[in-house]
Amino acid sequence: MEIRRVYIDDIIDNEKNIKNYLEDLISETTKVDVKERIKEIYDRMKVFLSDNSAIIYGGFDNDAMIGFIWAYEINSMVYHINYFYISKAYRKRGIGTELLKQIEKECKAKHGKEIELWVKNDNYSAIEFYQKNNFAESSIKMKKILKIN
């Protein structure tokens, strides 16, 4: 098992795994065309890695990506975790915690003061994970579904 920075070659070599992970993430939270959304996110991942605006770390087992965390700098003080996923077969082994520590380490090295993320209020395992890693609830997102007549 290896935790390391992800580069463009890793994204290309692990395209199938990444798209499967994105499908798991997206299908839980949206009703949009999942395949198109996965392609869009995967393409952005490659662009943001190429222009160094993404911070991505991955967990690898024999060169196969088994999870990743993708963050970016909002401003010099605040970093946002955009996507975070560990393959179901590898959960509860400390991989997520190690990936999170890598993001924290990199943010501290750049003098960042805060890491933020969104988590759905019914994703209890994620909420528990973040609380265990010293994250605290800081806001509540409100939304209204509009009816189209």
List each model region and its residues.
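Acetyl-CoA-dependent GNAT
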Residues: 2-78, 82, 87, 100, ...
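Loop/helix-junction capping segments adjacent to catalytic residues or to phosphate/diphosphate-binding pockets
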Residues: 12, 93, 124
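A generic structural signal for beta-strand entry/edge sites
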Residues: 76-78, 114, 139
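Conserved acetyl-CoA-binding loop-helix of GNAT-fold acetyltransferases
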Residues: 86, 92-105, 128, 132
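Conserved active-site alpha-helix within GNAT-family acetyltransferase domains
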Residues: 97, 121-139, 144, 148
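Conserved GNAT acetyl-CoA-binding A-motif
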Residues: 100, 107-118
